[in-house]
Amino acid sequence: TLDRSSAASDVYKRQLGNGGLGRLAACFMDSLATLGYPAYGCGIRYRYGMFKQQISDGFQIEVPDNWLKDGYPFELRRPEYCYEVKFGGYVQESTDENGELHFEQKDYQSVLAVPYDMPIVGYDNNVVNSLMIWDAEPKNGFSLESFDQGDYDKAVEQENLARNLVEVLYPNDNHVKGKELRLKQQYFFVSASIQRALARFKKHHSDLKDLPNKAVFQMNDTHPTVAVAELMRILVDEEHLSWDDAWDITTRCVAYTNHTIMAEALEKWPIEIFQRLLPRVYQIVEE
């Protein structure tokens, strides 16, 4: 026989963050499942999550918490739903025979966002929603050509780009590299999640103007707010809707909860970093 208590105690606790923001997100997911609302929670599958605390001579020491070292039985990898997320490069503008402007991102770096589903079980109602957390994988992987030429850093550049995105929650942003990584993390899971949601919608519906009647994106504090501009980018550039139609859809299917007015929670990004990492998204923000 299976002792559920014993089995559960053998599973290493996933350390994907804590605090009020994470607690509220967990409450949202628990309530949605218990009330029978179909919903996905979206985030990043951090390889180390929060740090593991050790005490030495009365002082705290933070060490990596490798919660995935023995695998995690309650997650399901879904490679069939992977999406490309692009960073950097430049935007090329062109005009078609009808005088319509088109925008294409060129010379970018990209990673593949691969979702892992975790079950969120409602209370006594046979409802199971999903926590969909995204892992980053290289699009091209190891470059044997660069390695054979002695350029070892370039050989693993794509692998490192992907790995760095999902290493830890809240990387130190007291320096430029840290700020860049945080912005990349936020855009990474937002872009992948919106691409997935729109793909699900289009599988069953043909008119994107009906999206606000079928779905809502709940932004939990400021960290995922680039979702507004990313949804506009996809609707305008990839689905070829007019700006006004895209804006009407976006304003009716995106919601936001603000948790605090503390300065560290109300994020600001240097224009140089935002424009360099997300050139097309920056254009939309400017517009």
Model-derived segments and their meaning:
Residues 208-210, 225-229:
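Glycine-rich phosphate/ribose-binding loops and adjacent secondary-structure elements
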Residues 29-54, 242-262:
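Glycine-rich phosphate/pyrophosphate-binding loops
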Residues 18, 34-118:
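Extended, regular secondary-structure scaffolds
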Residues 13-18, 45-48, 216-222, 234:
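Conserved short loop/turn motifs at secondary-structure junctions
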Residues 46, 53-63, 148-151, 232-234, ...:
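Short secondary-structure boundary/capping segments
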Residues 1-8, 12:
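Single conserved hydrophobic/aromatic residue that forms the stacking wall/gate
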Residues 77-220, 269-287:
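Active-site cores of enzymes that catalyze phosphoryl transfer or operate on phosphate-rich substrates
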Residues 228, 232-286:
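Extended, well-ordered alpha-helical scaffold/bundle regions in very large, multi-domain proteins
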